[in-house]
Each structure stands twice: as structure tokens, then as C-alpha cells.
């Protein structure tokens, strides 16, 4: 086992603390949900606020790993904080469950495009990790002004119900509590659940609400008469339990969860957790906030892993990629961490290590800070494309759980080789200083300026340095905006932005969630030699 000597670099802590304070402010604002008027109206109807519902549902004192709390940020003005839905994983009656809770204080809980994406992402987490789903329903259905973005396509609203059906078929429990409106297609959430609860004189379920019924048939009927709790619990049979209020409904859901039975045994050996020898808050000191500034990634590893100890694989070979066996909160992990640009040797080492972890049922933790693969004539002649492809293939085919944390830059093909979103990591998080794009803004501006300059030169048109700079400036600005972690997390390119000092805790929680899902057989395609 290896513990490197620790030498803290000049402090970068002030900038990290500023970034974390900005993150916490954004999280607090999103957690409020709708505006004060909407929240007061919600409470005046005898309802608990959405986060109160989640808190009451969870086992007291247990953690809640929230997914994408800043989804939709800035995408629809201020209309949809958190995409109007709360998703995450928490313990209910002793069993880890995925929780999906509509926030009716945000546009009546209606589904914007990012609301659908966030709901589907939560179901994907449930399916990958074999976790029961609990839906706290209070939604007006699809947001009609954007119906073309939420209704017809494969990954739109209907996929929610497809997922419910297929997960139930796999033995993954589906439970719904109707705590408010459940309208139109949304009515299938309780109807397709294994068990459903509804609150008396508060919850309603109908495919067509009173206005639609009147328009279609001329019948005038109240929401309670059309689809209230008494109707569905006594007459239609759509729901199985009638609750008096939110508190009673959540009590019933907890009782249902108590019948789920135990989860599968862990797929790997879990030992006693040992705290690192070095405080996690020191990550603020050892990691430059600017991803372009080099540092030794070993300094990150020793502040995340148990006992600050790890066994490095091929330490003297391909040194721009650190590969190591370690433990986090008692769980084994194979760490793949960038320590510079990727060369052929780094990629071959990474592919070898990933295969080893896959064979040994060791989950993989990718720490991304990657500018990409080395470029140039000699490197192309040396086969860097085929060697990089080996690592990308290994990442794609590995059947063990993969977790990714973007701790700096995530650029170009380096994103692929380090298990970016397209490679289905079980979870992916970003630090507040992270950046993500096809290449850096300066590189993009230079490439496009070169192309433009050649076009002008061929036409015999002069191009002054000032004109070239004026051409480059908006490109840099675009990449700075779109490479920002808040731009990423708004679009669910990740599962959330986390405080660097919380990395060990978040990774440990995720490993505990991944541990009980059966693993597929190892299988790889052709590695081009």
C-alpha cells in the first residue's frame, strides 16, 4: 500500500470557498421551489411542502442523495427551479429507494422538457441499481405550451410509464402516493404502480379533468366527483389505500416499503470504513480552481480514500494517468485519475486496469481533469487513435458500476475515455470549478479563426489582427458560458454539482447503492492491435 508524502501547495482555498458559497446559494434558492405566494397557497390547502414530504418519508436521520437539484436552471427564465421535481435516493423503512416528488408550487407540478428528463434519469438510476421507486404525485401533467417537447418522442412523457411497467416486471417495486392532482397521462403513474395511495378530498386521478369532460361531453362534474379518493378507493379500484392527509399517506407508504424484503447480497467485499489521514477540506488547498493549472492528482486521491492508502498499478508507466486500487467507506474501488494529457501509454494502461477491475468485480471511480489525447504527427503515426480506442472500448464494456467526478476540465475525446455521460456511469458529478466542452474556448476560437483566415486569404481579402480578435471574442464567450458547470447541470449532463469536500461522502453513498445490483457477464469486442 502506498501513501505519498503530502506537501500542500499555495492556498487556492479562497476561490474554492467562493465557488462553494455560490453553489450553496443556488441550491438554497432552488430548494424553495415556487414563489412565496405559490408556497402559501399550497400549504393553505392542508398540504405539506414537497421537501417536507420527502423528509417525512425518509427514515429519521438518514441521508438523502439528491439528483440534479439545479436542473433547468436558467433554461425557462425563473419558471422551473429544480425542473419542478425532486428526485433522489434515500432510506425508507430500512430499504434504499428512489424517490420522485412533484413540486406543485412550480407551475402546478407540470412537466417541462427537463422535468421529464429528470424523472427518467431517476428511473434509470432505479433500474441500474435495482432500487424500489416511490412516486409522490402532485402534478397537472404535461406543460401544454411545450407539448411538442414532452409528449411524442421516445424519451418523452410516455417513457415514464414504460419504465414503470418494465421495472415492475423485473421485480423492482413501484409505489405511488397521490397527494394532489394526477391528470391526463400522469394518471398512469398510480395506475401502473404495484400499490397506490390517495389522500381523501385532496388527491385526484383522471385522464380528462372537469374542463375537458365539459368540452367533450357537456357533463359538469367536480374534480372530487370525477376522480377523488373515495371514488378510486371504493368504486374504480385504481388506488389501494385511502389516506386522511399527507402525513397518513406517507405513513402508509412507509408501511408498504416495510414489506419489500431484503435487497440482494453485496457484489463485493465491504470492510470497515477508515477515515483519510488528511482532511477532505484540504482539497481546497491542493487543487487549483483553474483546470489549466497542473498539479499532482495523488493529492486528491489521498484525501478521498480510506486511510489515505492505495496500491498504485503501473506507477512508472503512462504516468499521466494514475490507476490504483483503494477503498472508499469500506467499498473497493479502482481509481482512474488524470494527471496530464493522455498518451498512448496512458490509454493502454487505463484499458488494462479497467479490464482487471471488471474481472475482479471492483467498481471504478473516474476523476476527470482531462484536456484530451496528445496530438501531432508522431503521435498519430504511433497509433494514438487505436490506443485511445482501446481505453474507450474498455470503459464502454465494463460491467462493474462506474462513478465519475469531474474535478477540473472535461474536454473532447478525453471525456469519452474517462467515462463521460455517454458511457453510462451509474452517477456523474461535477465540482464547481469544473469545465466541460468539446475543446477549450481558446482552442475553438483559434481553430475557427484559422479556417476563416484561410477562406479570406483564398479570396484575397485582408484580415487585420483586430478583426481576427473581434472574430475570436464571441467564440471564447460562448464556450465559457456553455462549458460552465451550471450550464451542464441545468441540462442533466451530470447528476449534480458537489462541494469538493463532500466527494468522499457522496462517492461512499453511491457505492452503497450500487453494491446490491447483480452484474452482467464480462464481455468485450475487438481491440484493434
UniProtKB/Swiss-Prot annotation:
Cysteine pairings via disulfide bonds: none
Every CoA carboxyltransferase N-terminal domain range: 16-272
Catalytic activity, as annotated: 3-methylbut-2-enoyl-CoA + N(6)-carboxybiotinyl-L-lysyl-[protein] = 3-methyl-(2E)-glutaconyl-CoA + N(6)-biotinyl-L-lysyl-[protein]
GO cellular component, one term: methylcrotonoyl-CoA carboxylase complex
Key words, A-Z: Transferase
GO molecular function: ligase activity; transferase activity
Residue ranges occupied by any CoA carboxyltransferase C-terminal domain in the UniProt entry: 275-521
Pathway linked to the protein: Amino-acid degradation; L-leucine degradation
Upregulation: Does not show significant changes in expression throughout M.tuberculosis growth phases.
E.C. number(s) listed in UniProt: 2.1.3.-
Gene Ontology terms describing biological process: L-leucine catabolic process
Primary enzyme class: transferase
Family the UniProt entry places it in: Belongs to the AccD/PCCB family.
Listed PANTHER family: ACETYL, PROPIONYL, PYRUVATE, AND GLUTACONYL CARBOXYLASE-RELATED (PTHR22855), METHYLCROTONOYL-COA CARBOXYLASE BETA CHAIN, MITOCHONDRIAL (PTHR22855:SF13)
Subunit structure comment from the entry: The biotin-dependent acyl-CoA carboxylase complex is composed of AccA1, which contains the biotin carboxylase (BC) and biotin carboxyl carrier protein (BCCP) domains, and AccD1, which contains the carboxyl transferase (CT) domain. The AccA1/AccD1 complex forms a dodecamer.
Job description of the protein: Component of a biotin-dependent acyl-CoA carboxylase complex. This subunit transfers the CO2 from carboxybiotin to the CoA ester substrate. When associated with the alpha1 subunit AccA1, is involved in branched amino-acid catabolism with methylcrotonyl coenzyme A as the substrate. Shows residual with propionyl-CoA and acetyl-CoA.
Protein name, per record: Biotin-dependent 3-methylcrotonyl-coenzyme A carboxylase beta1 subunit
Biological source species: Mycobacterium tuberculosis (strain ATCC 25618 / H37Rv)
Taxonomic lineage from the root: Bacteria, Bacillati, Actinomycetota, Actinomycetes, Mycobacteriales
Amino acid at each position: 500500500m502506498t501513501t505519498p508524502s503530502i506537501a500542500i501547495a499555495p492556498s487556492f482555498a479562497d476561490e474554492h470557498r467562493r465557488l462553494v458559497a455560490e453553489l450553496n446559494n443556488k441550491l438554497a434558492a432552488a430548494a424553495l421551489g415556487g414563489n412565496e405566494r405559490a408556497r402559501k397557497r399550497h400549504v393553505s390547502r392542508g398540504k405539506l411542502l414537497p421537501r417536507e414530504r420527502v423528509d417525512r418519508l425518509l427514515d429519521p436521520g438518514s441521508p438523502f442523495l439528491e439528483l440534479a437539484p439545479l436542473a433547468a436552471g436558467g433554461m425557462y427564465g425563473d419558471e422551473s427551479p429544480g425542473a419542478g421535481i425532486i428526485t433522489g435516493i434515500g432510506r425508507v423503512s430500512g430499504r434504499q429507494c428512489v424517490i420522485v416528488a412533484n413540486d406543485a408550487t412550480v407551475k402546478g407540478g407540470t412537466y417541462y422538457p427537463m422535468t421529464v428528463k429528470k424523472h427518467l434519469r431517476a428511473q434509470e438510476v432505479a433500474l441500474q441499481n435495482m432500487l424500489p421507486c416511490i412516486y409522490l404525485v402532485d402534478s397537472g401533467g404535461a406543460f401544454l405550451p411545450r407539448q411538442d417537447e414532452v409528449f411524442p418522442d421516445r424519451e418523452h412523457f410516455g417513457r415514464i410509464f414504460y419504465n414503470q411497467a418494465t421495472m415492475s416486471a423485473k421485480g423492482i417495486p413501484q409505489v405511488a402516493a397521490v397527494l394532489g392532482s394526477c391528470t391526463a397521462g400522469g394518471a398512469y403513474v398510480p395506475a401502473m404502480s404495484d400499490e397506490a395511495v390517495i389522500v381523501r378530498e385532496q388527491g385526484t386521478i383522471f385522464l380528462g379533468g372537469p374542463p375537458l369532460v365539459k368540452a367533450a361531453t357537456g357533463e359538469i362534474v367536480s374534480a372530487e366527483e370525477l376522480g377523488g379518493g373515495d371514488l378510486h378507493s371504493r368504486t374504480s379500484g385504481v388506488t389501494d389505500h385511502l389516506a386522511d392527509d399527507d402525513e397518513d399517506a406517507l405513513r402508509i407508504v412507509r408501511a408498504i416499503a416495510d414489506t419489500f424484503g431484503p435487497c440482494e447480497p453485496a457484489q463485493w467485499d465491504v470492510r470497515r470504513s477508515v477515515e483519510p489521514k488528511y482532511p477532505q477540506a484540504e482539497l481546497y488547498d491542493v487543487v487549483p480552481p483553474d483546470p489549466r493549472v497542473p498539479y499532482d492528482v495523488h493529492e486528491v486521491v489521498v484525501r478521498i480514500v480510506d486511510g489515505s492508502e492505495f496500491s498504485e498499478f503501473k506507477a512508472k508507466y503512462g504516468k499521466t494517468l494514475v490507476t490504483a486500487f483503494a477503498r472508499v467507506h469500506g467499498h473497493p474501488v479502482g481509481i482512474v485519475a488524470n494527471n496530464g494529457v493522455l498518451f498512448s501509454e496512458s490509454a493502454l494502461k487505463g484499458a488494462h486496469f479497467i479490464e482487471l477491475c471488471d474481472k475482479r468485480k471492483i467498481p471504478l471511480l473516474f476523476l476527470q481533469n482531462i484536456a484530451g489525447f496528445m496530438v501531432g504527427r508522431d503521435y498519430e503515426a504511433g497509433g494514438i487513435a487505436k490506443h485511445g480506442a482501446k481505453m474507450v472500448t474498455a470503459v464502454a464494456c465494463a460491467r462493474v458500476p462506474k462513478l465519475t467526478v469531474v474535478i477540473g476540465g472535461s474536454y473532447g475525446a478525453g471525456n469519452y475515455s474517462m467515462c463521460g455521460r455517454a458511457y453510462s456511469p451509474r452517477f456523474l458529478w461535477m465540482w464547481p470549478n469544473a469545465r466541460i466542452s468539446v475543446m477549450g474556448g481558446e482552442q475553438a476560437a483559434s481553430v475557427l479563426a484559422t479556417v476563416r483566415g484561410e477562406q479570406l486569404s483564398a479570396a484575397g481579402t485582408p484580415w487585420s489582427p483586430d478583426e481576427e480578435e473581434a472574430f475570436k471574442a464571441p467564440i471564447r464567450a460562448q464556450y465559457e458560458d456553455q462549458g460552465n458547470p451550471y450550464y451542464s447541470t441545468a441540462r442533466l449532463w451530470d447528476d449534480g454539482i458537489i462541494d469538493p469536500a463532500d466527494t468522499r461522502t457522496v462517492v461512499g453513498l453511491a457505492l452503497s447503492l450500487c453494491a446490491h445490483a447483480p452484474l452482467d457477464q464480462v464481455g468485450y469486442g475487438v481491440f484493434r492491435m
